[in-house]
Amino acid sequence: MKILFVASEVTPFAKSGGLADVTGALPKSLKKQGHDVRIILPFYSEVERGGYGIRKGRKSVDVMIGGSVKRGLFRHTNLEDIPVYLLENKEYFSRDHLYGTASGEYPDNHLRFAFFCRGVLDLLKKMDYRPDIIHCHDWQTAMIPLILKKEKGDDLFFSKTGTVFTIHNLAYQGLFPKEAMVDMGLDPSLFTIDCLEYYGKVNLIKGAILTADVINTVSETYCREILTPESGDGLDGVLTLRKNDLYGVLNGIDYEHWNPATDRGISKNFTPGAPAGKAANKKALQKRLGLEIAEDIPLVGMVSRLTEQKGLDLLEALLPRIAKAKLQLVLLGTGDEKYLKLLQEFAALGTDNVSVNIGFHPELAPQIYAGSDIFLMPSRYEPCGLGQMIALRYGAVPVVRKTGGLADTIFDERDQPKEPNGFSFDEYTPEALWEALSRAVEAYSDKAAWKKMMKRGMAGDFSWNTSALKYEELYRLVLAKKGR
């Protein structure tokens, strides 16, 4: 199959979250299955600064956006042996950030990604490249299935091309004023209850849900959750209309990148069969961060966006107890100003068993995974989550809230027929989190049982290989819809 991935971020070129990890890893697994896979993303300043052997292309497109023609130039490089195209427009993409600043999202994001979506489709024609599948990701690419269905339904060039739309996080829907439609090149007739209209605004994800051939989310549990009013973010009714075309496919992690046996960024490599290096990494992390060097004290790691979605309000309520507990907490992340300030003020109190590390420090993240005994993910909701899988790979036992992909990957001995690989809690309360964390801390004192659980987690398979096979099945469903 010829498969084109269209995404607003792709590791290693540009990243703000887990979306980039998926779009950087899944194509490689599909390529290994023998498919013709290609990727396209915007040519951001971040990409330009990174180098990546990017070359100027000969193709360009002219797109009518915001009442004037905007030119896009195409560049190209490779991700291993996968062709990668990048759409350049300095007005829209030569900025310090991908989507906005700490003050908020860029006010012209609707124009930026309308230009991107239209530019992608125009490029395909100029290249005479007809993908079997265009795989779109999140609201930034949601216009592609909409355009193909509503504007290009009679275009023979795309007549055999199908679309898969993946929802990585339903909370981000691409909501814009009705008046923005004209500037995005969208016909006002699409502003209806059965297309783009959503409480007086344009909802791009709604449009994609209603027009993509197949929709999927990034875990089976999250797929079920978003069909309910509690977790559907206002789109549960629309999703229910398409429930026969809605699937859950658990994300994986890149096992070549996240590999404690070969990771050069950690102090000592280790494997499930020879896990002794784990203790050396813990000692190195404690030393680096000024924590007491003690093997008997469980080290709890957390690498996360610092937002309420990730459970920071629960952590906030427990900080006084954590400061007095026989454990160490190492936290890395950036996010909402409220939590940044709170954690910085807490760290300033001189608590000697807590290390707060604010900012994006990619070299520290693998050291935390490798050095932690316990890994904390108390999310309010979590479509999939990658941190818990990386933690398992690096021998850290997760403590998670039982939601979304966390429920599909972490099994607590209390309520799972499967052998346990972590600890979980149901109620979104500080007490429920504290009870689960306390059970983990207590379990750590039984070294033999803990080592067994740790090795079980490390031996689990959360690679992209299984996920890639499931995506192949979705692609075949789409082709069948196209009569192929």
Curated annotation (Swiss-Prot):
GO terms for cellular component: cytosol. The keyword Glycosyltransferase applies. Pfam families: Glyco_transf_5, Glycos_transf_1. Pathway: Glycan biosynthesis; glycogen biosynthesis. Its EC number is 2.4.1.21. ADP-alpha-D-glucose binds at K15. One of its GO terms (molecular function) is alpha-1,4-glucan glucosyltransferase (ADP-glucose donor) activity. It catalyses: [(1->4)-alpha-D-glucosyl](n) + ADP-alpha-D-glucose = [(1->4)-alpha-D-glucosyl](n+1) + ADP + H(+). Gene3D superfamilies: Glycogen Phosphorylase B. InterPro entries: Glyco_trans_1, GS/SS, Starch_synth_cat_dom. One of its GO terms (biological process) is glycogen biosynthetic process. Keywords: Glycogen biosynthesis, Glycosyltransferase, Transferase. Transmembrane segments: none annotated. The keyword Phosphoprotein does not apply. It comes from the Bacteria. It is an enzyme of class 2 (transferase). HAMAP family: Glycogen_synth. Belongs to the glycosyltransferase 1 family. Bacterial/plant glycogen synthase subfamily. Synthesizes alpha-1,4-glucan chains using ADP-glucose. NCBIfam families: glgA, PRK00654.1-2. This is Glycogen synthase. It comes from Geotalea daltonii (strain DSM 22248 / JCM 15807 / FRC-32) (Geobacter daltonii).
